[in-house]
Amino acid sequence: MVYQLVAWTDRGQVKLLPELLREYAQPYIERIESLKAFYDEGWDDELGRLTEQDVIALSRSYEEYGRFLRLHGKCQEAFEAFVNAASVCLDDRFKIDSEYGYVLVGVLPKRFHAAESLCLDLIEENPALTRLPKWQRLQERFRELEAPFAEERRMIRRELHANRAFNFGRR
């Protein structure tokens, strides 16, 4: 009887042989590719137009794939999957023109923040990930979306500081 090493643990992470990792990752990749085809097309004759739920499904698929990769010690690949999960939520097709400027509609901003928090968790473990171009592009796109609210946030912060100063020492 011959035994073959297929997996081991290293610093709390399960490591697999590369060919096994590719085999186990295949269902995640296939799901992402099928959803991405519809996402890129934006329209399907049978299903209709692209909806928020389609974008969220694609984002969650990227997240599941990222969690799989992270579990198996592929930190940078997991980070890229999490960045993809966040970036699909910033789709221009789901922006509306409001009195403040262009803003995302529905639950997409919340989904973006959920995926971004996974990225930030990995950045805490490995700060070098912030230098990846994908992460920097994602941050730039998000700043563009948040720009209409910057003045409002500054005003709220100013009022909060004034209120704290006014109430300093009172009980």
Stretch-by-stretch model annotation:
Residues 49, 56, 93-95, 130-133:
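Residue signature of alpha-solenoid helical repeat architecture, marking inter-repeat boundaries
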Residues 35-46, 88-89, 119, 126-129, ...:
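Alpha-helical junction/boundary sensor with strong preference for TPR arrays
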Residues 55, 62, 97-99, 136, ...:
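TPR repeat positional signature
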Residues 68, 103-105, 142:
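Residue-level signature for tetratricopeptide repeat
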Residues 1-63, 67-77:
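C-terminal leucine-rich, beta-strand-based interaction scaffolds used for sensing/assembly
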